Amino acid sequence: MVSVEDLHGLSAGQASVPDCKLFPQSPSAATRIAVLLAAALAGAAGGVALASAAGPQPLWAVLGAAAVAGGLLSTWSPCGYSSISLLRPDGRGLRAVAGWLPTFAMHGAGYGLGALMLGGLLGGIGLIAGFSGFGSTALLVLGLVGLAYGAHQLDFLRVPYPQRRAQVPHDARQRFPKWVIGGLYGLSLGLDYLTYVQTPLLYMMTLAAVFTGNIAHAIAIVALFNLGRFLPVAVNALPIPDYRVQAWLARHQENAALADGAILTALGAGFTVLALI
């Protein structure tokens, strides 16, 4: 197996190089079962704790943390790779990073606008449908969705995962300044359903936003998810070559899916227990 680091060091005069294959070893069935059981038990215990909590703040804290985690895990989607590799400073050093900051800021602004638009839509749908928060039925639906997609991510169950198989348009970078591209990419990714997102946590956060029946609360949930999507681009401010960032992401692809499955399972178990108590 040839790593990206190995290829980087090959001389320019070499006529050809072996294919680069960065396919991490999939976790064993025993590992996946252990993760599933541990996450379910931890989630159930969390559900019991939430049931005894005074006020909705702990539940909102769990949802907020899950939203940010979902956004971070979406970095392992094609658009996550693309935004990190394409929205890089031109050159190296502090001056290059300073010149790149408007691109970074516009990227964040695009995500913010996407959160306002998608969150406003989801909250409005929930308001029209008559939802008013996380009652037993809403929690049970969220719980079952989390358990199903947790098993899906851990490769125990096949669940439909409809997504738009598209990425942000790479050719746009040839037509606009980079700071404009940063904003356009941020808006495209911040609307969340215009491009492919690999984590089913997006579905849970979408349902949660609708169930609030509150536009401001729905925007907050989507904004936290988008914050998690936006933050990894900050790695471009560090003196780390792009090929190393991409190689690290590729090596941890299976670990990301494992973490995704664990979070979904824990949330599913917790919300199900909370709904039934």
Swiss-Prot record:
Return the GO cellular component terms, semicolon-separated.
Answer: plasma membrane
Name it.
Answer: Methylamine utilization protein MauF
Recorded topology in the membrane: Multi-pass membrane protein
The UniProt keywords, alphabetically, are:
Cell membrane, Membrane, Transmembrane, Transmembrane helix
Major subcellular location class: membrane
What species was this sequence derived from?
Paracoccus denitrificans
Q: Which residues cross the membrane?
A: 33-53, 59-79, 111-131, 132-152, 179-199, 205-225, 257-277
Q: Which domain of life is it from?
A: Bacteria
